Design a protein with these regions (language model features):
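Short, well-structured alpha-helical segments in soluble
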Residues: 76-87
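Rossmann-fold NAD(P)-binding glycine/threonine-rich loop
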Residues: 104-125, 230-282
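Glycine-rich phosphate/diphosphate-binding loop of Rossmann-like nucleotide-binding domains
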Residues: 41-51, 134-225, 229, 234, ...
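Short beta-strand elements in bilobed, periplasmic/extracellular small-molecule ligand-binding domains
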Residues: 56-70, 185-188
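Short glycine-rich anion-binding loops that position phosphate/pyrophosphate groups of nucleotides
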Residues: 90, 95-100, 210-213, 231-234, ...
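Short beta-strand segments enriched in small/hydrophobic residues
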Residues: 31-41
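Anion-binding alpha/beta catalytic cores of soluble intermediary-metabolism enzymes, centered on
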Residues: 92-156
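Positively charged, low-complexity intrinsically disordered leader regions
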Residues: 1-28
Length: 283
């Protein structure tokens, strides 16, 4: 068994987006648009935003990037988010933001049908209730796409999944999404006892703890699907995930996502998919 070809999955997703774009009558409709609001000067955010803009432009989605000063006041940030929401089909607040701002309030100002990140309380509730209009956070959707691709049948009934992450970006929405598709999901976190007992028995293991090469062969067994959402740097400054891929593959026959070139590239592709979903909700 080997590393999962996430580039092939990404291309399938982007081709679907292209197909949806071709259905639009541009004589009467504008092209789908995405607004990205960045607050402050976070280096990682610059890279992520650049990748999103590049991908969107390559497939025909219009992007407006709004850069705000890191010392902006809460009320002014709220005003800008409300104003920008009116002018676009989809809008996102690039995280993280400066600590003096109330992230929850800012995110929940975004209308549900334009919440391309799927992070508003309303969207999260709709996802839990399996509402067809729910917008799924892009990383969680990317993980779901990988599982579907690897299972081939697309049927998650009876599949045991352990997710080691309980964030709103990955763990919580992924638990809801997979449960809605009849998988059996165990959500683990930093307070979980005997983590190895959960990971070893599962068909699928999803990690997202932000610890370089934390998971070695102790946590896995043969014939598992391992999806690594971690993005870290090892002691040599090299990009790596949460899983020690080489060590695990020496011990067990597993399928595992690479880092880099794994879940990260699918997150951007799935964001484009969500832009189309937002557009369709409004047209």
């Amino acid at each position: 068994m080997a590393k999962i070809d996430c580039k092939a999955i990404r291309e399938e997703i982007l081709q679907h987006v292209r197909d949806e774009l071709e259905k639009i009558d541009y004589e009467t409709e504008l092209a789908p648009s995405l607004a990205i609001i960045t607050i402050g000067d976070d280096d990682a955010s610059k890279v992520y935003v650049r990748n999103k803009i590049k991908t969107a432009n390559s497939i025909g989605i219009e992007v407006k990037h709004v850069q705000l000063d890191g010392d902006i006041e809460q009320k002014e940030a709220e005003k800008i988010i409300i104003e920008e929401s009116i002018e676009t089909d989809a809008i996102m607040l690039q995280l993280p933001i400066p600590k003096h701002l109330d992230e929850k309030i800012l995110i929940n100002l975004i209308p549900q049908c334009k919440d391309v990140d799927g992070l508003t309380d309303l969207n999260m509730g709709m996802l839990v209730n399996n509402h067809p209009y729910a917008i799924v956070p892009a990383t969680a959707m990317g993980v779901y796409k990988i599982i579907n691709y690897m299972l081939e049948t697309g049927d998650l009934t009876g599949v045991d999944v352990t997710v080691v992450n309980r964030s709103q970006l990955i763990g919580k929405p992924l638990q809801a999404l997979l449960t809605n598709h009849n998988a059996t999901v165990t959500l683990c976190h930093s307070k979980t006892d005997n983590l190895q007992n959960h990971t070893c028995r599962s068909h699928v293991v999803v990690t997202g703890i932000g610890q370089p090469k934390y998971f070695d062969s102790y946590y896995f067994s043969d014939y598992q699907l391992i999806i690594d959402c971690g993005m870290n740097r090892d002691e040599n400054g090299k990009l790596c995930g949460d899983v020690d891929v080489d060590e695990v593959q020496q011990e067990f026959k597993v399928h595992v996502t690479p880092t880099p070139g794994g879940t990260g590239i699918l997150t951007t592709a799935c964001l484009m998919l969500s832009v189309i979903h937002c557009y369709n909700l409004q047209h």
